[in-house]
């Protein structure tokens, strides 16, 4: 019998009701300011981060290998046989690679790591759909096969009032940011 766990990172935008219903494990990013550090969605809210951006742009750091390993140890202790990890774009974070490295240490748990090539709501929608499929009794292989099709149906657009924060936060390069600002 398959016991499937869902895991994501705190870049995922998903409501607490869905997290609770499908027992989704969320591994937090670190939010780093010059003189302080917070655990995303534990010590600091998204609203607080946005409010603080007026005075300082934080850096972020992916969930640590230790955090991922700890989550896997708990899943192993709870007799999970499979993990579906839906994570932030590998182009924005090393989370995908960290999951790959750690998951290989846990041979008793078959893992599928999905690089959303996106973030936020995209991760959340895919996880909710996976939760529904698990609840319906679908097998791991079937769910994993369905994920890329789920993603094809999702299209998101981000509109920035300014590229300043993306540039200062290190998400786009100085030259790209400057060119983008000039085109604005």
Where are these regions (language model features)?
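Mixed-charge interfacial surface used for oligomerization/domain docking
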Residues: 2-5, 11-19, 24-25, 29-30, ...
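N-terminal glycine-rich anion-binding loop in soluble enzyme alpha/beta folds
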Residues: 4-63, 67
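Glycine/small-residue-rich loop that forms an oxyanion/phosphate-binding "nest" at active or ligand-binding sites
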Residues: 85
